[in-house]
Amino acid sequence: MKDYTLIALAYNQEIRIYTSVSTNLVEKSRKLHKTLPTASAAMGRFLTASAMMSLMYKDGERLTLKIDGDGPIGQMTVEAKNGVVRSTILNPNVYLVYGEGPKMGKLNVGAAVGAGTLSVTKDWKENYFTSSSPLQTGEIGDDFTYYYATSEQTPSAVGLGVLVSRGKKVIQAGGFIIQVLPHASEKTLNQLESIISKINSVTDLLKSNHTPEDMINILSDNTGEILEKHELKYHCGCSRKKYFDALSRLNKQALEDILHEDGQAEVVCQYCNKKYIYTSEDLTKMIASK
């Protein structure tokens, strides 16, 4: 099944709901970055939330989202536009679980991310706007909920989940974002709060093979009207030419130093780990163009 997001209105158009399945793109990220389970869960939640956020803007803004925590994962970055995402992670080799309590043995994403900030930069026709908020728990969903309330002034509830197998493969990923519209009544808010309180976790919904359609029915108490469906995917978009052009922008001295010291240039894409080699002939062409 392809990854996709549904956008719906519910409760007499008082609530907007986004629901997603993102298993394929999160698994692709895991393979590209070789993440261990807790890093996979953190990155997967971040990718899913970012993909949904990118569908909220109709003018084609490219979003760059960063979670900069003091936990072992370090900084994570996602670029997102119209449901297409790519990501980087500073330390993919993180496998932390709860050692005690009711969550014993489960992935401890909050500790892996730590304290820090969530920032969002919107690139609209090369005009850049950045807003940020402090991380609340490092669990990603809570952090996006707080971001929407403080930076976008949009009361929201964000639920995210990633299920990783014992073999480290991502077997389910998805989530939802609920946005309260300005004219929502107290009755609707109470009803919605009651429904959300009965959901143990998004992971439980995913384990039960609930689709985005099912999630809308549950969250909307069967009042949802689906308006849009968007495919989600992980796509890097890098190419040999793009990195050739980037290298060519180095000054002549820097290029000559690379040529004389290394004889070639090696570039590794941080979003997909693809390696590009530029030979002495390539470097000579770049130098000659100066």
Curated annotation (Swiss-Prot):
One of its GO terms (biological process) is protein refolding. Disulfide bonds join 236-238, 269-272. GO terms for molecular function: protein folding chaperone; unfolded protein binding. Under oxidizing conditions two disulfide bonds are formed involving the reactive cysteines. Under reducing conditions zinc is bound to the reactive cysteines and the protein is inactive. Coiled coil: none annotated. Keywords: Chaperone, Cytoplasm, Disulfide bond, Redox-active center, Zinc. Its main location: cytoplasm. It comes from the Bacteria. NCBIfam families: PRK00114.1. Redox regulated molecular chaperone. Protects both thermally unfolding and oxidatively damaged proteins from irreversible aggregation. Plays an important role in the bacterial defense system toward oxidative stress. Belongs to the HSP33 family. This is 33 kDa chaperonin. It comes from Acholeplasma laidlawii (strain PG-8A).
